């Protein structure tokens, strides 16, 4: 899979975005995030300033208290992230998010299949295929579709 993504990044098809747009719709008809939740179990989102404001207000906490309780600052990337996994807001019995309505933008957009032009996110998909069945299916279907072009 990774080799395919690397080759695709180097030899771009002009129809890549059209093909991936159609595949994206198929993938979501076949995917149930609540049966998996690997993103919440194995990864951590980054928290934007807006995320911090929204979530801490929802929890009736100060931003400072929210950061101290659950987050760590990554000096290299400049991002606030969860201190540990699985996510503190994941209900492990139901795989549901306890702050779904106000979850971080990174979570709301994950796995970023149609976030930007496909070429701009191939490197992200390359990372996410190990965690996300939707990403894996997307890449698998893209591989088949590109052999037909």
Language-model-detected regions and their locations in the chain:
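Short loop/turn segments that flank or connect secondary-structure elements
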Residues: 1-149
């Amino acid at each position: 899979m990774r080799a395919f993504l690397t080759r695709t990044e180097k030899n771009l098809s002009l129809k890549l975005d059209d093909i991936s747009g159609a595949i994206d719709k198929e993938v979501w008809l076949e995917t149930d995030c609540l049966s998996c939740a690997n993103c919440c179990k194995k990864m951590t989102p980054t928290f934007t300033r807006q995320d911090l404001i929204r979530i801490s207000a929802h929890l009736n906490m100060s931003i400072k208290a929210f950061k101290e309780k659950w987050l760590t600052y990554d000096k290299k990337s400049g991002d606030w992230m969860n201190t540990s996994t699985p996510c503190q807001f994941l209900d492990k019995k139901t795989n549901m998010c306890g702050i779904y309505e106000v979850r971080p933008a990174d979570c709301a957009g994950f796995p970023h299949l149609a976030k930007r032009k496909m070429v701009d996110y191939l490197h992200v998909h390359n990372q996410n295929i190990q965690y996300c069945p939707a990403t894996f299916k997307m890449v698998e279907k893209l591989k088949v579709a590109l052999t037909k072009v």
